[in-house]
C-alpha cells in the first residue's frame, strides 16, 4: 500500500471514529467472505463493518482522539462503526458471534471510553431504546393515574359521607315523625 493510500485510509478510519456513536472491535479469523457479508447485512445501514490493518487503525484512533483500544488491535481485526443505536448493533454482533464461533468480540468504544467484552455484552443485553422509552412512559402514566386517584379519593369520601349523613338525617326525621 502506497504512503498516500495509507494516509487516505487513516483519514477515512479516523473520520468513522469521529462520526460513530460507538464502535465494536472484533476478530474475524476463520470467517468467509459470505459470513462477513451476512454480518454486514445483519448490522443494517446504520453500522459500517470495516476490515483494516491494525497499524492504520491505531494511527486513525490516535488521530480521532480515541484512547484505550491499542490492546485490541492484534490479529485480524475488524471494527463495527455504529452510527445509530448501539444496542441494536451490539445485539446483532452478539447473535452473529453466537451462531459463528469464529467471530470474537474484543471490546469496544463508546462515550469517550474503551469498553470491555463484558460491557459490550451488557449493552447487547439491554432492551432497545423504543422499549425502554415505552416502559418509562407506562411507569409515568401509572404514577399519574395513582396521583389522580389519590386526589379524587378525598372528594369521593366527602360525597359518600354527605350522602350517609343525609340518609341518617332522613331516617332520624322519619323515626321522629313516626313516634
Curated annotation (Swiss-Prot):
NCBIfam families: PRK00099.1-1. Coiled coil: none annotated. GO terms for cellular component: large ribosomal subunit. One of its GO terms (molecular function) is large ribosomal subunit rRNA binding. Forms part of the ribosomal stalk, playing a central role in the interaction of the ribosome with GTP-bound translation factors. Keywords: Ribonucleoprotein, Ribosomal protein, RNA-binding, rRNA-binding. GO terms for biological process: translation. Pfam families: Ribosomal_L10. Belongs to the universal ribosomal protein uL10 family. This is Large ribosomal subunit protein uL10. InterPro entries: Ribosomal_uL10, Ribosomal_uL10-like_sf, Ribosomal_uL10_bac, Ribosomal_uL10_bac_type, Ribosomal_uL10_CS_bac. PANTHER family: 39S RIBOSOMAL PROTEIN L10, MITOCHONDRIAL (PTHR11560). Part of the ribosomal stalk of the 50S ribosomal subunit. The N-terminus interacts with L11 and the large rRNA to form the base of the stalk. The C-terminus forms an elongated spine to which L12 dimers bind in a sequential fashion forming a multimeric L10(L12)X complex.
Amino acid at each position: 500500500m502506497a504512503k498516500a493510500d495509507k494516509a487516505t485510509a487513516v483519514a477515512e478510519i479516523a473520520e468513522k471514529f469521529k462520526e460513530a456513536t460507538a464502535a465494536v472491535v472484533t476478530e474475524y479469523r476463520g470467517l468467509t467472505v459470505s459470513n462477513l457479508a451476512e454480518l454486514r447485512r445483519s448490522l443494517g445501514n446504520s453500522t459500517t463493518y470495516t476490515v483494516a490493518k491494525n497499524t492504520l487503525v491505531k494511527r486513525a484512533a490516535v488521530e480521532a482522539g480515541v484512547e484505550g483500544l491499542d490492546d485490541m488491535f492484534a490479529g485480524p481485526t475488524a471494527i463495527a462503526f455504529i452510527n445509530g443505536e448501539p444496542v441494536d448493533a451490539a445485539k446483532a454482533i452478539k447473535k452473529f458471534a453466537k451462531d459463528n464461533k469464529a467471530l470474537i468480540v474484543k471490546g469496544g468504544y463508546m462515550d469517550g471510553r474503551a469498553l470491555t467484552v463484558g460491557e459490550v455484552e451488557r449493552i447487547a443485553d439491554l432492551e432497545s431504546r423504543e422499549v425502554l422509552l415505552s416502559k418509562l412512559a407506562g411507569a409515568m402514566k401509572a404514577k399519574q393515574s395513582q396521583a389522580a386517584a389519590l386526589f379524587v379519593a378525598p372528594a369521593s369520601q366527602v360525597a359518600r359521607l354527605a350522602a350517609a349523613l343525609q340518609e341518617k338525617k332522613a331516617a332520624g326525621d322519619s323515626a321522629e315523625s313516626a313516634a
